[in-house]
Amino acid sequence: MRRRKQNWLFWLLSICLCLTFGPFQQTVKAESAPLDIRADAAILVDAQTGRILYEKNIDTVLGIASMTKMMTEYLLLDAIKAKRVKWDQMYTPSDYVYRLSQDRALSNVPLRKDGKYTVRELYEAMAIYSANGATVAIAEIIAGSEKNFVKMMNDKAKELGLKDYKFVNATGLSNKDLKGFHPEGTSTNEENVMSARAMAMLAYRLLKDHPEVLKTASIPHKVFREGTKDEIKMDNWNWMLPGLVYGYEGVDGLKTGYTEFAGNCFTGTAKRNGVRLISVVMNAKDASGKTTKEARFKETEKLFNYGFNQYSLETLYPKGYQLKGKETLPVVKGKEKEVRVATGKNLDLLVKNGEEKQYKPVYVLDKKKMTKEGKLVAPLKKGETVGYMTLEYKGDDSLAFLSPDMQKNIRVPLVTTAEVEKANWFVLSMRAVGGLFVDLWTSVAKTVKGWL
């Protein structure tokens, strides 16, 4: 009877344990499953710091198709800012632009050969509808010819610090599809190519330097030349804009692309709760391995879900934070012999859930403001920057950025919390004399000690 009771208790306990721990174990497994992005290359980036949150083959050079137009946008917005080009400036199509714009097998708004179009009209057609004729028109407006513009594109890429890129035309079309009208100096079989890292870097700089790009990139529908015989409805190819078929909360850019060479590509950006992310997928594919328009949005959705669900913006160290044991720095030639220092701003960072304690604060002092002995020199103003505080990451992987110089994006100034006036000559003289006597006494003491 006792043995039966023990068996009954054993089975009851086993059932309870299964009910208690079974679902928990399944949940942990699901949450820790790796992110499976079906694309030849992909990247997810914090748009504030340039920190890489996810990467796959990010330095592999691949076709970029119409994502090319982001560089054309950058150069146009540069020219607008520099007042070399005006939004209301008029343009009449060249023979080439006219012919290209009439090709309805490509993304286009047909332009009249004798028509007059504003730069803004052409820009909207390019940014919303990916119109290729309008894109070459912009290239001609800025540089006089697409050939000259292509040189500007490559020069700007170098200036922006991009690696692994080559531009051969302004649109992203395959040169072979330009029917012999590819830019002079390029060949029929050439393509625009970049790595996912370079593409994300271009998006990062576009958003930093020209945030106004989102005003147009976020327009889901617009009518070109509305109210005229030439009007044509332009539907944004970015189907992740809210209200469209793959609408995603917070998405407001940037650019899709497709050619047979590049496959379906998309550089996206979305903002939620003060956090902006940048994503790139190149040659995105469905479960069968086929590249499709839908796949580029579904794979991007995976990236955004990962970023917004697994990371949050945290104030790791507030303004006024003082590192324990390093609250003060020594000062020479001042009325005071030391000064308190603290951070001049909040140190905010996009942190993966559960990793808040994986970051260690580190002071880096400005050597130009220090003596060889490591002391500050009076006078010092309150709030004067004497260095910066950055972070060391103690997690499994190192912090990765689009480029090494972006490490500076996770630092805040280290400032003095009070003014230190320079001591007058008498005080400095007495200190010097006092120092002399101290040195003399120390020397004598050492000598006497040596006799004993």
UniProtKB/Swiss-Prot annotation:
Signal sequence interval, chain numbering: 1-30
Keywords: Carboxypeptidase, Cell shape, Cell wall, Cell wall biogenesis/degradation, Hydrolase, Peptidoglycan synthesis, Protease, Secreted, Signal, Sporulation
Presence of the UniProt keyword Lipid biosynthesis in the record: no
Binding residues for substrate: 255
EC code(s) of this entry: 3.4.16.4
A single GO molecular function term of this UniProt record: serine-type D-Ala-D-Ala carboxypeptidase activity
Keyword Cell wall biogenesis/degradation annotated: yes
Family annotation (SMART domains): PBP5_C
Catalytic reactions on record: Preferential cleavage: (Ac)2-L-Lys-D-Ala-|-D-Ala. Also transpeptidation of peptidyl-alanyl moieties that are N-acyl substituents of D-alanine
Top-level taxon of origin: Bacteria
UniProt subcellular location: Secreted, Cell wall
Residue numbers annotated as active site: 66, 69, 130
Example GO biological process: proteolysis
Pathway participation: Cell wall biogenesis; peptidoglycan biosynthesis
Family annotation (PANTHER family): D-ALANYL-D-ALANINE CARBOXYPEPTIDASE (PTHR21581), D-ALANYL-D-ALANINE CARBOXYPEPTIDASE DACA (PTHR21581:SF11)
Family according to the record: Belongs to the peptidase S11 family.
Biological role: Removes C-terminal D-alanyl residues from sugar-peptide cell wall precursors.
Name of this chain's protein: D-alanyl-D-alanine carboxypeptidase DacA
Organism: Geobacillus stearothermophilus (Bacillus stearothermophilus)
